[in-house]
Amino acid sequence: MQIKTKFKRNNLVEIIAEKLNTKELTDIISSEIDKEVKLRFYTQKDPKGNKWQPNGRGGKILRDTGQLMNSIHRISDGKVGGVATNKIYARIHNEGGIIRPKEKSKLKFKGVDGKFVFVDEVEIPKRQFFGMNKKLKDRIKKKISKKILENIKNS
């Protein structure tokens, strides 16, 4: 004995799409990423769980003023969900790299002792705060699946 059910694929897809608010889904994505990225500033760990390299001054890494962490904001428009920052120094801290002077012969900044230091270059260690990992992806998938099922049930 066989039981066969035929769905008109177009009708089912149309029903789901009609009831599905993609803005809700991208809101979930951006919210979960935002929480995870900001948590990394407190745990001082990268997406793989590795500790960030300590800084020379001690204290909380990348949190002296809180400007970088507080600049991270959600992006969600129904097509894309994520986070961004407008701080130009975010990339060098996230990816690491070498900073060299552009206009002068030396870089000038305050050292650990508060006195000015002049150097040819500064190596910034990678302290990744942006990035996905399996745990975050799984959490997002679970929340999106739940939201889709709620929308289907309520239709």
Indicate residue ranges for each PLM-predicted region.
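Short, Lys/Arg-rich flexible segments
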Residues: 1-155
